[in-house]
Amino acid sequence: MTTSLYWQTEGEGSDLVLIHGWGMNGAVWQTTSEKLSQHYRVHTVDLSGYGHSAELGSADFDEMVKQVLAQAPKKAAWLGWSLGGLIATKAALTSPERVSQLITVASSPCFSAEKGWRGIKPLILSQFTEQLKTDFTLTVERFMALQAMGSPNAKQDIKLIKKAVFSRPMPDQQALATGLMILADIDLREAVSQLSMPVCRMYGRLDGLVPIKVAHYMDELMPNSAKIVFEQASHAPFISHNDEFISELRTFLNQHA
C-alpha cells in the first residue's frame, strides 16, 4: 500500500502549496496553477483518499496535516480553500518555520454554526453524513451546487468544478466522512492569534457555506491579517473570478516576499 500523497509541481520560483477542499481534488486548481506557475513553483496536492491519493488509513485531522507536511517543500507559502484552509492553518500553527505566508480562501477556523458564530448548521452537516452512507456521489454533487450557490455564474462554476473533480478518481467514502467530522468538530478560533507569519483571508461575499459575517468576526480575532472580499463571488472565487483572484494573491505574496 502506498504511503504517500499525490502531488503535482510546476513552474519555477518561490514555493507555493495549494490545498483543495472537501469532496474535491487538486484538479480544481488547474487554471489557477497554470497561471501561477509562470511566477512561482506551485505544488498541488490530492489529500488522502481524494483524487489520485489512496486513503492512507483512517486519518484524523492532525494526521492529515502531518501527511501534507511530510511531502511539502521545506518552506513555502500555503494556500488552502475551505477545508484546505483549516489544514493550512493547522500546519502554520504546528510548523510555523515551514509556512512563510498563509492564505485561506472561503475558509473559517470553525465551520460549524453556533450561538454568536455564523457557519454551516450542524443539521446540514449531519444530513450530509447520513447521505454519504446511501449515495456518496450524489452527496458530493450536492455539495458542489452549494459551493456555487449565490454566484451570478453558478451554472458555469458548477460545470467547471464538476469537470475538474470528475477528471480524477472519486473520493474515498471514509475520507469524505472524516472530512465532514473535521468540518463539524474542529475549532481553531482561540489558536489563530498565535500565527506569526503574514496571513491573508479571502472571502466571497455571496458565500453560503462561510457567510461573510465570518470575515468580520475574524477581523477581531486576527486584526493584523489582510482581508480580501470578492463582491460577486460565492464559495469558489478562484473559479468564478480567476484573474481577480490571482491578481490579489500575487499582490499579497509580493508584499510579503
From Swiss-Prot:
GO biological process: biotin biosynthetic process
Positions of substrate binding: 22, 82-83, 143-147, 235
Major localization listed first in the record, in broad terms: cytoplasm
Superkingdom in the source lineage: Bacteria
Occurrences of domain AB hydrolase-1 (ranges): 16-240
Function: The physiological role of BioH is to remove the methyl group introduced by BioC when the pimeloyl moiety is complete. It allows to synthesize pimeloyl-ACP via the fatty acid synthetic pathway through the hydrolysis of the ester bonds of pimeloyl-ACP esters.
Sorted UniProt keywords: Biotin biosynthesis, Cytoplasm, Hydrolase, Serine esterase
Organism: Aliivibrio fischeri (strain MJ11) (Vibrio fischeri)
Family annotation (NCBIfam families): bioH (TIGR01738)
Gene this protein is translated from: bioH
Pathway note: Cofactor biosynthesis; biotin biosynthesis
Molecular function in Gene Ontology: pimelyl-[acyl-carrier protein] methyl ester esterase activity
SUPFAM superfamilies in the record: alpha/beta-Hydrolases
Protein name according to UniProt: Pimeloyl-[acyl-carrier protein] methyl ester esterase
UniProt-listed PANTHER family: HYDROLASE ALPHA/BETA FOLD FAMILY, PIMELOYL-[ACYL-CARRIER PROTEIN] METHYL ESTER ESTERASE
Keyword Hydrolase: yes
Similarity remark: Belongs to the AB hydrolase superfamily. Carboxylesterase BioH family.
Catalytic residues identified in the record: 82 (nucleophile), 207, 235
Catalytic activity: 6-carboxyhexanoyl-[ACP] methyl ester + H2O = 6-carboxyhexanoyl-[ACP] + methanol + H(+)
Annotated Gene Ontology cellular component terms: cytoplasm
Subunit structure: Monomer.
Compartment(s): Cytoplasm
EC number in record: 3.1.1.85
